[in-house]
Amino acid sequence: MQRFPYSLLLLLLSATNRSRRHHITRPGRSIHWCLVRPTRPNRMLRAIRTCGARYWRNWPLNWPRKAGLTRRSSARIGLSDALRPCPTLFGCFKRRYARQAMSCYCRTEWRVNWLKKKRRGSSRWRRESSVWRCWK
């Protein structure tokens, strides 16, 4: 009888592991939420793994720290405008999405749609008196 390839099992387990929430996802992995930094649009966008309702309960408080933002940088980009759901699964890691016209969901929109997953309209980033806003 052949020996079972345990490395394959480990590979499968690591692929389905959702408990590691602080690591930055790579383009090959599934991306759930991305942190948009409009002040440095040419940089690779950072994606953050989330882990269910317990994580979201104190959402506005724990986001900046989890995202690795300092107080100064979060003030500069405007936290509420900077944190958005990912536009597409792999989209936020393609360089062209990192420009000013990055497609995004508006906050009011995903708040509603996150509970009942309906069709989400597309929107765009716009600069408005030194604040980045998500527009339809």
Swiss-Prot record:
Induction (record text): Expression is up-regulated at later stages of infection.
Subcellular location field: Secreted; Host nucleus
Keywords for this protein: Host nucleus, Secreted, Signal, Virulence
GO cellular component: extracellular region; host cell nucleus
Chief location bin: secreted
Signal peptide: 1-21
Sequence motif: RxLR, positions: 43-46
Keyword Transcription among UniProt keywords: no
Role summary: Effector that partially suppresses the tobacco programmed cell death induced by cell death-inducing proteins.
Domain comment, as recorded: Has a conserved RxLR motif that acts to carry the protein into the host cell cytoplasm. Lacks the 'so-called' EER motif, which is found closely behind the RxLR motif in most of RxLR effector family members, but the presence of an EER motif is not always essential for the translocation of every RxLR effector into host cells, or for inducing a hypersensitive response.
Family: Belongs to the RxLR effector family.
Protein name (database record): Secreted RxLR effector protein 63
Gene: RxLR63
